[in-house]
A protein has these predicted regions:
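Short, intrinsically disordered, charge-balanced linker/junction segments flanking boundaries
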Residues: 164-168
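Charge-rich, well-structured scaffold segments of protease-associated domains
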Residues: 2-162
């Protein structure tokens, strides 16, 4: 399993999706920052999306779609958002339609990732007592040459904030 590399050192790996973002996150101790950054960038930018995994995940999503269909509150909220944000991405159902999902392929996933998962369209957020210079160097190295003309230019928009003491 892909998260074993972090779980072996007491870390945690997870992800979630909203209408505006997909978030991949890891929690690790400071010495394992490099391992977590490497794993997250590998997952985000280098996943291969084998068809059998897509098929399995599509069924999970289709089950979620069915459970939402049994929830009047969810249906009302989705309808409200669709009217409020008509013609915009925020007005679309985040889960999609089961009949369309069942035809989803590896090629579809890779096409989506190439279009949307680029370093110029990503935010790397690190908090904790980790040296900012180390974060910059690590992220620059891990994103060099990935899907954007500015790949590796992480420091351009990066902001380092002072580490607060526990007593602050």
């Amino acid at each position: 399993h892909i998260s074993n590399g972090l779980e072996r050192v007491g870390g945690d790996l997870n992800a979630f999706t909203t209408k505006q973002e997909t978030v991949y996150h890891a929690t690790v101790l400071r010495p394992d920052f490099g391992r977590a950054a490497d794993l997250l960038t590998d997952i985000v930018f280098h996943s291969t999306y084998p068809q059998h995994e897509i098929t399995r995940e599509v069924e999970v999503i289709c089950d979620e779609i069915e459970s939402y269909a049994d929830s009047p509150a969810e249906i009302i909220f989705d309808e409200f958002e669709s009217m409020l944000f008509e013609g915009q991405s925020l007005g679309r159902d985040i889960l999609g339609r089961a009949e369309r999902l069942r035809g989803y392929t590896t090629a579809d996933a890779l096409r989506y990732v190439r279009r949307h998962y680029r370093t110029d369209n990503a935010v790397f957020f690190v908090y904790g007592n980790v040296d900012f210079g180390l974060v910059e160097r690590t992220m620059r190295r891990l994103t060099m040459g990935i899907g954007a003309e500015n790949a590796g230019s992480i420091g351009e928009n990066a902001v380092g904030l002072p580490v607060a003491d526990a007593g602050d």
